Amino acid sequence: MSELEKAVVALIDVFHQYSGREGDKHKLKKSELKELINNELSHFLEEIKEQEVVDKVMETLDSDGDGECDFQEFMAFVAMITTACHEFFEHE
């Protein structure tokens, strides 16, 4: 498997490690999203401690307005982070 294919599998696996702990196994609730960000993105994003920060992140990601983050919305989030990291490292 190529590095990119491994990355795709890893993204799917990480999403499903956190989704469904509290409900729909195909969506992240706010608490699941917070835990995912704090555990899996700690080198790129600050730890989320305040509920209002979680609310704002979810509001930004939740394109269909259901109050949860589905896989497509999660991937849009990953794309935003990846783009920001690319721009940061490009200037170093």
Curated annotation (Swiss-Prot):
It comes from the Eukaryota. PROSITE patterns: EF_HAND_1, EF_HAND_2, S100_CABP. Residues 13-48, 49-84 form the EF-hand domain. The modification N-acetylserine is found at S2. Ca(2+) 2 binds at D62, D64, D66, E68, E73. Its main location: cytoplasm. Ca(2+) 1 binds at S19, E22, D24. It holds the Pfam family EF-hand_1. Signal peptide: none annotated. It is found in: Cytoplasm; Nucleus; Secreted. GO terms for cellular component: ciliary basal body; cytoplasm; cytosol; extracellular region; extracellular space; neuronal cell body; nucleoplasm; nucleus. Zn(2+) binds at H16, H26, H86, H91. SUPFAM superfamilies: EF-hand. Keywords: Acetylation, Calcium, Cell adhesion, Cytoplasm, Metal-binding, Nucleus, Repeat, Secreted, Zinc. One of its GO terms (biological process) is memory. One of its GO terms (molecular function) is calcium ion binding. Dimer of either two alpha chains, or two beta chains, or one alpha and one beta chain. The S100B dimer binds two molecules of STK38. Interacts with CACYBP in a calcium-dependent manner. Interacts with ATAD3A; this interaction probably occurs in the cytosol prior to ATAD3A mitochondrial targeting. Interacts with S100A6. The S100B dimer interacts with two molecules of CAPZA1. Interacts with AGER. Interacts with PPP5C (via TPR repeats); the interaction is calcium-dependent and modulates PPP5C activity. Interacts with TPPP; this interaction inhibits TPPP dimerization. Small zinc- and- and calcium-binding protein that is highly expressed in astrocytes and constitutes one of the most abundant soluble proteins in brain. Weakly binds calcium but binds zinc very tightly-distinct binding sites with different affinities exist for both ions on each monomer. Physiological concentrations of potassium ion antagonize the binding of both divalent cations, especially affecting high-affinity calcium-binding sites. Acts as a neurotrophic factor that promotes astrocytosis and axonal proliferation. This is Protein S100-B.
